[in-house]
């Protein structure tokens, strides 16, 4: 059975899908103990970002909130939709617009680290006490070469 996934782009300054994104983030937080941002921080950062969204039957199932410089503030895919390539497609969408993509991931978030490393991100440095709760982070980077979009597109096709 084929499932249709619609994509949308929320431009900076918009509230479109912010509540659904918050609810998805919170569901992941409850289940996995990651994505621990406070509501005010999350919504403010969301509104200042370009947000790439995937919806299934009008329900938000994945999103990436990205700054103008290609820094991914938030990347989340519903646990029910993982393994379908949505995360890769979100990163590929970011790669279409940016030569370099960067992000932070908790040192304890093995799922995220495996995902990013599979896509070719490199850990550039560790930052102790990066998060508000004292959690440590890795700063990750992908790209800065002309073939970034092609490499990501190839991964998505796999």
List the model feature ranges, each with a label.
Residues 71, 76, 102-104, 139:
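Conserved beta-strand segments that form the floor/walls of ligand-binding pockets within enzyme
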Residues 41-42, 109-111, 132-133:
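Short secondary-structure capping/turn micro-motifs that flank functional sites
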Residues 12-80, 88-93, 156-158:
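Acetyl-CoA-dependent GNAT
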Residues 74, 78-91, 106-114, 118-119:
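Conserved glycine-rich acetyl-CoA-binding loop
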Residues 104-106, 122-139, 151-152:
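Conserved catalytic-core motifs of GNAT/GCN5-like acyltransferases
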Residues 96-109:
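Conserved GNAT acetyl-CoA-binding A-motif
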